[in-house]
Design a protein with these regions (language model features):
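Compact alpha-helical subdomains of small soluble proteins
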Residues: 76-147
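Cleaved targeting-peptide boundary
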Residues: 17-26
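Sec-dependent N-terminal signal peptides
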Residues: 4-14
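Secondary-structure boundary elements
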Residues: 12, 18, 143-147
Length: 147
């Protein structure tokens, strides 16, 4: 009986440990595969994710490349502004309400990138390579270059 209880306990611990190591977010590509890109909510989320990933990239390179770090922050803020505009148009929100919600959303997403970037660093000594973060940055770069 003790062995069965021990096996059950170990099973739950190993399952929980795998959940802890899993990424916080799914990639933007996976997200968009399940959503309608024409939907305003999807577009707002995409703009927020891209703003967050550019903010994250800016923070990572700040000490080694301040010029590009500043460019990334400018891009992130531009994407954030577009998200605010879309919320006002799509959801008929007031400017201040839209701004607060978008900033809170970006902060949460930014923290998720930080957490997943740290996990990726522990795994392969890169904040980007070998993770969905690199893929997200590539997708967002295409979005920024289209505009």
């Amino acid at each position: 009986m003790k062995k069965i209880n021990l096996l059950i306990f170990l099973f739950f611990i190993s399952t929980y440990a795998n959940d802890i190591k899993a990424d916080t977010e799914t990639s933007i590509k996976e997200y968009l595969n399940k959503k309608n890109i024409e939907d305003g909510a999807t577009q707002i989320y995409l703009l927020n994710r891209c703003s967050a990933v550019y903010t994250y990239a800016s923070a990572i390179i700040l000490k080694i490349d301040t010029e590009n770090s500043k460019k990334f922050i400018d891009i992130a803020n531009n994407l954030l502004f577009k998200s605010i505009e879309l919320r006002i148009i799509d959801r008929k929100e007031k400017l201040e309400d839209a701004r607060k919600k978008v900033e809170a959303d970006r902060e949460k997403l930014f923290q998720n990138y930080i957490n997943d970037g740290k996990k990726n660093w522990d795994k392969n000594k890169s904040y980007f390579k070998g993770s969905y973060i690199s893929e997200d940055l590539s997708i967002c770069e295409k979005l920024v270059n289209e505009k």
